[in-house]
Amino acid sequence: MKVTKAELAHVAVKAEQYPKNQLPELALAGRSNVGKSSFINKMLNRKGLARTSGQPGKTQTLNFYEINERLYFVDVPGYGYAKVSKTERAAWGKMIETYLSEREELKAVLQLVDIRHRPSEDDQLMYNWMKHYGIPVILVATKADKIPKGKWQKQLTAIAKTLDKEASDPLLFFSSATGLGKDEAWRTILNHLKVTE
């Protein structure tokens, strides 16, 4: 998809701060430092729109990125990061759970996992939780440029097996560094939303 307009339109910690224009939303979930901000920047062709950080746990709000006035990417706080207080983690958890389980505009979750590693227990819990709530999932294996191309399929198979992935859930590889997988990711997203470019 050709992105002509992209902006951070809303920052929310509670439902009354969510956008009111009823555009379809795709949430991005993943462990801290899996590359959600880099994914957003590469997909939207906007360097620095989503702030990347070497410090895990940087995103602490629901960040709504409006794209071409047609849809939103919603960056949610990364999970699995221990260096925040239990109180903060509980607050994030409640905020994320409320959004994911109750938001009517949410059409799917892009769950990002690192292609170099088997999904963590947190990844598995998140995937199973979304399946429990009937939320469609598009799995994106990030950092594909970090391993040889010959190992991609083996790693994708391991990811699918570890998560006990449902056959209907797409599993894509992606590299924010090279743009690898970007077109396929957009095709999958638009197909899921049943909209054309």
Curated annotation (Swiss-Prot):
**Keyword Nucleotide-binding annotated:** yes
Binding positions for Mg(2+) per the UniProt entry: S37, T59
Q: Which cofactor does it need?
A: Mg(2+)
Q: Where is the EngB-type G domain?
A: 22-195
Any Gene Ontology biological process:
division septum assembly
The job of this chain, per UniProt, is described as: Necessary for normal cell division and for the maintenance of normal septation.
Keywords (alphabetical) are: Cell cycle, Cell division, GTP-binding, Magnesium, Metal-binding, Nucleotide-binding, Septation
Gene3D superfamilies for the chain:
P-loop containing nucleotide triphosphate hydrolases (3.40.50.300)
In the record, the note on similarity to other proteins reads:
Belongs to the TRAFAC class TrmE-Era-EngA-EngB-Septin-like GTPase superfamily. EngB GTPase family.
> HAMAP family from the entry?
GTPase_EngB
State the protein's name.
Probable GTP-binding protein EngB
Q: Where does GTP bind?
A: 30-37, 57-61, 75-78, 142-145, 174-176
Give the NCBIfam families listed for this entry: GTPase_YsxC
Organism of origin:
Shouchella clausii (strain KSM-K16)
Write down the InterPro entries for this protein, in alphabetical order: G_ENGB_dom, GTP-bd, GTP-bd_ribosome_bio_YsxC, P-loop_NTPase
Q: Offer an example of a GO molecular function term for this protein.
A: metal ion binding
What's in the GO CC field?
cytosol
CDD domains this protein is in?
YihA_EngB
